[in-house]
Amino acid sequence: MSRIGRQPITVPAGVEVEIDGSTVKVKGPKGQLVKEMHRDMIIKYEDGRLIVERPANDKLHKSLHGLTRTLLNNMVVGVTAGFQKNLELVGVGYRASKQGNKLVLAVGYSHPVEIEPEAGLEIEVPAPTKISIKGVDKEKVGALAAAIRAVRQPEPYKGKGIKYEGEKIRRKVGKAGGKGKK
């Protein structure tokens, strides 16, 4: 059996789970998530625990077993605690601000870059060089963080750009311009 897939998910008090065929609906204090799981996976909700079982032991079902369990766990964690991703802006004059619901980035282009979050996502700018993304859907939070990072990825020479908090940028040594033989 899958080591991750066989672990049951404990559903905390205040979280409602509805299973309709392969569609799972999780409702909690932070919001609601609905996700379509693979039709072959068997999902049961009994005694305040979610259990995922697979119909066969072939390679496809073994890989789907752990995936389905992790997706369900992310849904439960999302509606109870939520997910957060933090970004940092590194570079002279690089800054972020909020205009209404939009995130406005000044990252060295001739124009400011505006990014509007999807419904259910919240962007905060605690400092001009810090961005915080919060939401109940881990996939959407990560996708928005990746889209913001892609606006100006960190470059390897000076490390300027938008990076995840705690991300280590592999640095390169620049050219040794004009220090060779003549």
UniProtKB/Swiss-Prot annotation:
Name a single GO cellular component. cytosolic large ribosomal subunit
What GO biological process, any one, is recorded here?
Answer: cytoplasmic translation
Q: What does this protein do?
A: This protein binds to the 23S rRNA, and is important in its secondary structure. It is located near the subunit interface in the base of the L7/L12 stalk, and near the tRNA binding site of the peptidyltransferase center.
Q: Which SUPFAM superfamilies match?
A: Ribosomal protein L6 (SSF56053)
Q: Could you tell me what this protein is called?
A: Large ribosomal subunit protein uL6
Subunit structure, per the record? Part of the 50S ribosomal subunit.
**Family in the record:** Belongs to the universal ribosomal protein uL6 family.
